[in-house]
Amino acid sequence: MNVSDDYRSNWESYWRETSEERGDAIWDSDPSLTAEPHSELLLPHADTGRVIVDLGCGNGTQTRYLATRFARAVGVDLSDAAIDHARRATAGPSVEFEQLDLTDTDAVRDLHGRLGDSNVYMRAVIHQSEPAARPAVATAVAELLGESGRAFVVELTSASRDVLQRAAAGPAGPPPKLRRVFHHDLKPAAAADDEIPRLLTEAGLKILATGETVLPQTEHFPDGTRIDLPARWFVLARE
């Protein structure tokens, strides 16, 4: 299957209207708050000599950090506009980017064929994917791992919806970066808590470790407190 035209269009329009400034996207947090601590959870299980594929890489902020911890990093995203952002911000042979629809089974299989068994980093992709597409996204993780790769997957929990609703209910309405998410009809924290581990295991993945965390955002409540969204992380291998 492939994602719907509306879903693809929403992400294209979002990234076309996003500036080159770090943090303009609400989830574009500094790697010291995201990919760095996530890498520390993945590294005990992963071979750093393998490539790591950043699924849903956006403008590549986390991908560029991952390239400092692994032999090579490849960022992929559904949005051509996001990949354009990532390429403009990146220099060096250890990082590259390409457009990829994770629900396109043949394209994912082709990427695995080119890279071999890879490590995978996926931050907050399944939770906002269209319901019919979520199994294919989980399957893409398994396909890219092959027999030897390891994955770090972190997804928002249902508690994030309460945080987002509280942020949107301020006297002035949603803060600007969150308002832009709603304007483009993106749907954060849409998956049920039990759906994520079920999809991962149904895709043939084994959970090696899991825990609770938050995903810091680049937006704030009216009182200046940073918006941190509750999430659950998983370190995974193929069964």
Locate each region found by the language model.
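A conserved beta-strand element that flanks and buttresses the S-adenosyl-L-methionine
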Residues: 120-121
